[in-house]
Amino acid sequence: MKHTYTLLCLFLLSGVVVADISGAALTSDGDTIAISGMKVRLNGIDTPERNQTCRNAGVTWKCGYEVTETLRGWLDTKEVRCLGDRKDRYGRLIADCFVDGYNVNARLVYEGLALAYRKYSKKYIPEEDKARAAKRGLWAGEFVTPWDWRRGKRLEPDY
């Protein structure tokens, strides 16, 4: 019993969060949702920022807004289940989320709407490779990676 109690204390002190939450989701942006008030950051992916623009065939489009709205459409009125094992520095649960039997994180990357966030996970690299090869979503044109966009990098002007 003493050994079990010690292990439990060590586990709790380690900061590991194991969560399985389900419910209606509110979409904050392309890779962040909230379920029952808990903010959830989709694991292993990064999407364009809400105000980010991309270019396809010389036409600039609001890719960040479009990705957010696409995710909202996928999740709207659906039961979303998220499985997470840790929180980020903003207190968001880092999780893989599922709706209608598919992995939302994987689908965003496969459709070319998100990038595999290699800095934190290698999980969705195969989906990104397929999206890039098929020139789906972001891969059909020009874009700045979300992590570079956050650092101030922008597309070169298209003259």
Segments from the language model and where they lie:
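Small beta-barrel nucleic-acid-binding modules, primarily SNase/OB-fold domains
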Residues: 3-5, 15-159
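Sec-dependent N-terminal signal peptides
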Residues: 6-10
